[in-house]
């Protein structure tokens, strides 16, 4: 039965109202809505997410001009604490996060994969109760090729005074994270986050200079066709991982997708389902990815979306690091697909 003009107008108004409500939902407003509170703790978390968003805007602006500016692309000639060659964009993004959080008054320490030790902000430490852990640029090898990149972040509450400057309270499992997420720098700049109340995505509207809500309570499919892994490392892996790769090669319905930027690959899997693997190798069974800056934040987010993250033997969020820059293997994504990889690791099939 055809709708009456009145009911049609009502439907249009309802759609318009929903669109306007979405357009008005900024990141800071959304955090407060999620916490259903204007308590000091809720306002702190909202302010911290605003700072992360500002860092993302600054990095995105720099990237959008990278091909037009001197001194942005290429390597610095230095090596970081991980033994990796440092890109100029790594240094810039790391400095951006430090500068942005110096002004927050809430963060006493920042810990990054680019710095051997945490960066302390003395003027914030008397009142700053939080620590930001982050990977300023994920996939920096993509920078010079104009491909997608990302930033990964987590917020933890400081425990104790850390008077000796060793930050031992950070050596705790991933369930201590208050918030985590990533910023994806692609055709648009997207921020995806969780504070333990689901996973939500925002897109940077350049005309407003604001991250605007695009999707709430994202759920990862239980199974997907995509597997994402650098198959160039095939002969460096344990036989169990090689057997899994042989399995997906001979089984109909699987598609390989690997961009070289973990944030980009995991975002695809969050939306479409599937599994991302960065296993250890025979020579380095602990893997390459850093627990505190990369795997734990992403594990928190994916679990909140209904997925799983594991080393192959242990849930990532249950791993207790022994040192700040501890590495770990990572299998992350849809529940069924992660379970299949685990089965190969634990049972050989």
Curated annotation (Swiss-Prot):
Substrate binds at residues 138-141, 230, 258, 288. One of its GO terms (molecular function) is fructose 1,6-bisphosphate 1-phosphatase activity. Mg(2+) 1 binds at residues 113, 135, 137. Its cofactor is Mg(2+). It is found in: Cytoplasm. It catalyses: beta-D-fructose 1,6-bisphosphate + H2O = beta-D-fructose 6-phosphate + phosphate. It holds the Pfam family FBPase_C. Keywords: Calvin cycle, Carbohydrate metabolism, Cytoplasm, Hydrolase, Magnesium, Metal-binding. The keyword Magnesium applies. Gene3D superfamilies: 3.40.190.80, Fructose-1,6-Bisphosphatase, subunit A, domain 1. Its main location: cytoplasm. NCBIfam families: PRK09293.1-1. Homotetramer. This is Fructose-1,6-bisphosphatase class 1.
């Amino acid at each position: 039965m055809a709708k009456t003009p009145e009911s049609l107008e009502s439907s249009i108004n309802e759609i318009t109202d929903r669109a306007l409500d979405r357009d008005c939902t900024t990141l800071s407003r959304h955090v407060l809505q999620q916490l259903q509170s204007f308590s000091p703790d809720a306002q702190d978390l909202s302010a911290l997410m605003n700072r992360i968003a500002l860092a993302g805007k600054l990095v995105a602006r720099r990237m959008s001009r990278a091909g037009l500016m001197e001194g942005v692309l290429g390597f610095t000639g230095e090596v970081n604490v991980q033994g990796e060659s440092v890109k100029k964009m790594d240094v810039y993004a790391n400095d951006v996060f430090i500068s942005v959080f110096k002004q927050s008054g809430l963060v006493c320490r920042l810990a990054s994969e680019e710095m051997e030790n945490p960066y302390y902000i003395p003027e914030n430490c008397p009142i700053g109760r939080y620590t930001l852990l982050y990977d300023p640029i994920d996939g920096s090898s993509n920078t010079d090729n104009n491909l997608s990149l990302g930033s990964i972040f987590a917020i933890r509450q400081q425990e104790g005074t850390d008077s000796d400057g060793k930050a031992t309270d950070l050596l705790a499992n991933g369930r201590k994270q208050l918030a985590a997420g990533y910023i994806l720098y692609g055709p648009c700049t997207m921020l995806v986050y969780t504070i333990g109340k689901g996973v939500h995505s925002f897109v940077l509207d350049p005309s407003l200079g604001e991250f605007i809500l695009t999707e709430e309570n994202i759920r990862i499919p239980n199974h997907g066709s995509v597997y994402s892994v650098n198959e160039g490392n095939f002969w460096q892996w344990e036989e169990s991982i090689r057997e899994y790769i042989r399995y997906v090669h001979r089984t109909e319905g699987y598609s390989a997708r690997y961009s070289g930027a973990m944030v980009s690959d995991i975002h695809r899997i969050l939306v479409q389902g599937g599994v991302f693997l960065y296993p250890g190798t025979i020579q380095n069974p602990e893997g390459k990815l850093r627990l505190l800056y990369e795997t734990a934040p992403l594990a928190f987010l994916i679990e909140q979306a209904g997925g799983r993250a594991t080393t192959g033997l242990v849930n990532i969020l249950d791993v207790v690091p022994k040192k700040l820059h501890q590495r770990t293997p990572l299998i992350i994504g849809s529940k069924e697909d992660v379970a299949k990889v685990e089965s190969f690791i634990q049972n050989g099939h």
